[in-house]
A protein has these predicted regions:
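Feature captures the catalytic ectodomains and active-site-proximal regions of enzymes
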Residues: 1-138
Length: 138
């Protein structure tokens, strides 16, 4: 980020996914803390560079560690909704209820690139958010 050599960086922090399959809550907490630290460093660098990012996940896992019916570790992926978080200098409003296939079109739009017709997803940005001064004037 600090070098400015790249227009886009896409990374996957797999820590909570990998540890979530073990069913060990202490390991999942440590993994989540490590990811939190890493994302914090990325966001700090983005702020210094004037960049923006999306933070999301492709599925849940570590939020459900125990099968409540059996009491055994729950080691599969979940289908729980995951957040889509925008970090940057602009205020943006995103549509709720998007799908994984909507992430790439949204990212392309943020980069000023056209969405290929082969992509079935949609852009999740619905409008620029109003700041407080705009809301007061409305």
């Amino acid at each position: 980020i600090e070098s400015g050599d790249y227009d886009v960086i896409i990374c996957n922090y797999a820590n909570t996914d990998m540890v979530g399959h073990t069913g060990k809550i202490e390991a999942a907490i440590a993994a989540a803390e490590a990811v939190d630290e890493c994302i914090g460093r990325v966001i700090s660098a983005l702020h210094r560079a004037g960049g923006e990012c999306l933070v999301t996940a492709d599925h849940g896992n570590a939020e459900k560690m125990v099968n409540h019916a059996s009491g055994q570790p729950y080691t599969a992926h979940t289908t729980n909704p995951v957040p889509l978080i925008y970090v940057g200098t602009q205020k943006k409003v995103f549509e709720e209820g998007g799908a994984l296939c909507d992430i790439a079109p949204t990212l392309l739009m943020m980069m000023g690139l056209e969405q290929p017709t082969e992509m079935s997803g949609k852009v999740l940005l619905v409008e620029p958010a109003l700041d407080e001064a705009d809301e007061d004037a409305a």
